[in-house]
Structure formats: C-alpha cells, structure tokens
C-alpha cells in the first residue's frame, strides 16, 4: 500500500518502488493520489498504481450529468448530484426493501437491511498516464 497525502507524493514514491525492484507488486493508494485529470505527461510516474475511483472520474462521457466531473472539483459536484438523487429516491430505498440500489456519479449506492447506505467505487489503474477501470 502507498499512502500519499496528495498526487505529488504519489508521483515521487511510485518510481522509487519500481527502482527498488518492486515494480511487479501491486501498489494501491487512496484516491488522493489522483489529480482528477487524465494527463499522460503528468501521470506517467503513476503507471501501475491502483486506486478506487468514482464512475464520473473514469468515464465522464458515459455517466449522465458528469460533464463537470472531468475537473478536480467534479468530485464535489458528483456528491451533490447523488445527494439530490438519493433524497428523491429515499422513500423508495428506505421502504424496507433490502439492497435497493442507485447507480450514481460517486458509485453504486445500496441500502442494507438496517437502512444504512453503502457506496461501492470502481478499482482503476494508471496505464500510460491515464486512469483505466480494471
């Protein structure tokens, strides 16, 4: 695991892991390792790094309303859009139906038996500077 505070630290540490003959090991990091921009030149040092990413970040063109997700503040936009959509669906999702789900911009959101919300993100890996879903 790699626990950088930001993408600059991830860009500094990941090449060191590769240099010390550990490049074939899977390296996982929190989403803070991602700048939110698919820039091959900027992200080339992150090759092979795996993170959990929201659908709006991975495929903004295929997620309705995700146009604003391509920029770093897009995560906040996605969270607000999902909060509004969940508020509109809450009566249906909390009606006692276990595993009611909603596929939103921040991932698949499901309700458990107790009414607790669970969010599932997608595993992605940097490949030639671009974040791709695994």
Positions of predicted regions on the chain:
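Extracytosolic ligand-binding ectodomains
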Residues: 1-134
